[in-house]
Amino acid sequence: MEVGVRILGTFCALLAFCCFVFRDIPVPAPTFALPVSSAPATPPDDKERVRSEIREVEKLLPETPERGAALFFLAELYKHLGEVDKVMVLLEECVALDQGFDPGAVPGFQAFRENARFREMVEQVRRRYRPVQHGHVAFTVADKDLFPEGLAVDPEKRVFYMGSMHRKKILQITASGEVSDFAKAGAYDLMPVGGLRVDPVNHDVWAASDPGVKNRSELLHFDSHGKLLERFPAGGAGPHDLNDLVVRGAEEVYTTDTDGNAVLRLDRKSHRFTQVRFPRPIFYPNGIALSGDAKLLYVSDILGVMAVDLLTHEAWDVVPDPHDTLAGIDGLYWYRGDLVGVQYGTAAFRVMRWHLASEGRRVESSEILERGSDLVKSPTTGAIFEGSFYFMANTGIENLRDDTILDESKLEPVRIAVVPLK
């Protein structure tokens, strides 16, 4: 869910994100040169769900430290209701905050390209945020139809693990790029494999899976040789989509439930899920990370990053740099007191590093590691290994819909890129 500043380059990838967030809402066919005056209003079937989200987000506006993210999200919601004037006002205020949000990269906004106000906003963002490239391709996985979502690394074994949404399996990749199956397709009746993490103590591998055709989203626990040891369906009233996860010691696993708008804690002894509480509603949570001492849990959603102290249960919004945002992070990782992530929330995909203050409650400064290059064509997650951040550059997820490949001519080997963390 994740690429540069070119409108056509971002269209397909962001269409996948919009279809994910509004997966129960029909998305109109794209129109790249339709004047705003003739743009059809295509209200979703579920108007009330969208209006309910609007009410919740508007309540947060007076106090949220992520005002730009809230405005950008509201603009997308109002676009789905066909309220064009409201969209323009929200986008103008958002862009004026200079936090990197790029309206021109949102598929739903392409109908506005002939609107002078919209064009000026896009040009302003493009002048301000130029391409940044610090990375290069580390190795390539030859299979073209994997559509990977999750990447993890075992630094001691020097092995990467990559999950396949389409093949429904997990690969292992050596640091030199040699590829083999870790959990074979068909072996355990897996659904599309999402986030992955390695237990640093025993080298076991944990995975989260999408609901798939059997509507069975679950956490999966493999031993270090690829044998499935345990599986934990989300259960309870849905919908559920367990997206990413972190392993905290031998007793608990935390996972983001994107469709359920929740973060869940799995008690490994009782095998029960409980919901983590936050001070505000959470919208489509995705990336998740633990601090180095495992006391703080960081969770990304469409409005930013929230943190929770796992000892006191106090939770808060992490305050971003005034001219930056923490909104919409797919892969989120802790590194030497900082957060590193693959970000889609600004609409133009980028790899970021956020330098946190010592208490972990606010960002002191941020650094764009990759933006607007072929290395962020359709990125999702990554892994930190030997002082560098490895991430999947071209997952192709925008070319997969309901487990069907939309255009086989666009299939290509998966490139794993790397950028140094100074």
Task: Give each language-model segment a name.
Residues 100-125:
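TPR/TPR-like alpha-solenoid helical repeat scaffolds
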Residues 127-147, 365-366:
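A short helix->beta-strand "capping" segment at the edge of beta-propeller domains
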Residues 174-178, 223-227, 267-271, 309-313, ...:
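Short loop/turn segments that connect beta-strands within beta-propeller blades
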Residues 142-157, 165, 187-211, 235-253, ...:
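Beta-rich, blade/repeat-based domains predominating
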Residues 217-225, 353-355, 406-422:
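Beta-propeller blade signature
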